[in-house]
Amino acid sequence: MVRAFKIKVPASSANIGPGYDVLGVGLSLFLELDVTIDSSQAQETNDDPNNCKLSYTKESEGYSTVPLRSDANLITRTALYVLRCNNIRNFPSGTKVHVSNPIPLGRGLGSSGAAVVAGVILGNEVAQLGFSKQRMLDYCLMIERHPDNITAAMMGGFCGSFLRDLTPQEVERREIPLAEVLPEPSGGEDTGLVPPLPPTDIGRHVKYQWNPAIKCIAIIPQFELSTADSRGVLPKAYPTQDLVFNLQRLAVLTTALTMDPPNADLIYPAMQDRVHQPYRKTLIPGLTEILSCVTPSTYPGLLGICLSGAGPTILALATENFEEISQEIINRFAKNGIKCSWKLLEPAYDGASVEQQ
């Protein structure tokens, strides 16, 4: 019997305002996997060591450089981890995965998180494991241990999340693949052993309301910035007053984004940050000027502005004048010789999905 299904996983923006490693929002830009399993086509997947033929649309981000071996690609490495945790060595015979990825790589829009979520769902579906989203989240968080992007991509909407501490024994297994956000070897080694199942409830989250009038403008510079490099510039310790600054604004922002009408006088200052953005200005030319000079008083409709994830993408929340706001930020990047594109997005309220075909 031939099986076919489509997996869709949204991009995400994390570190919203003061919510470093806490707040994330799923965005209406989707990684898509078209999957078929047909044992009569097994000869077409024999070149792959794990029975999976992987391909990408030519329009996909990273089309010319993304690895196509199932044990090297992050999506399929993740799926193999799920399978092997459940004592299944390989993909079913004749598995084909065709990927369409419009999410820019290394720009702070959750491309790695989307790949991990897609991979966990792929493993769950091909083996018909029947996991809930909450259980799949545990698998995701073993691989990418930053719950803000992962939770927003899996669950959708505007989320706050935290990750409980894991023991060294729980995270040191070589079979666990590691996403690109961590400055470590890629993991996912095939030791021939059955990896232990992930602990349950590794991450906890809540979904906040979001005023639907608020749109997300992503201004995307044409250069990549790895999360590992971006984390490398952060200090090991912070002044107490900087942590209090963020905590105060975090408490206000999660409610301010639900209010109707949106209040720029409340949201704009509540989206300020002292934990990561000041330290990343050396990696993103023009960042300080952009965050301080593009304001609601100069651009009506603008509510707030921040780095998206680790950057370099800028996330601006607004209710109108989207093109004018985008062009101003693009022009400021251009002063530093950096070209940009921009996208107008909305929250992806439902998160990741599977459609049987």
Curated annotation (Swiss-Prot):
It comes from the Eukaryota. Its EC number is 2.7.1.39. Keywords: Amino-acid biosynthesis, ATP-binding, Isopeptide bond, Kinase, Nucleotide-binding, Threonine biosynthesis, Transferase, Ubl conjugation. It catalyses: L-homoserine + ATP = O-phospho-L-homoserine + ADP + H(+). There is a cross-link at residue 133 (Glycyl lysine isopeptide (Lys-Gly) (interchain with G-Cter in ubiquitin)). Present with 92600 molecules/cell in log phase SD medium. Commits homoserine to the threonine biosynthesis pathway by catalyzing its O-phosphorylation. This is Homoserine kinase. It comes from Saccharomyces cerevisiae (strain ATCC 204508 / S288c).
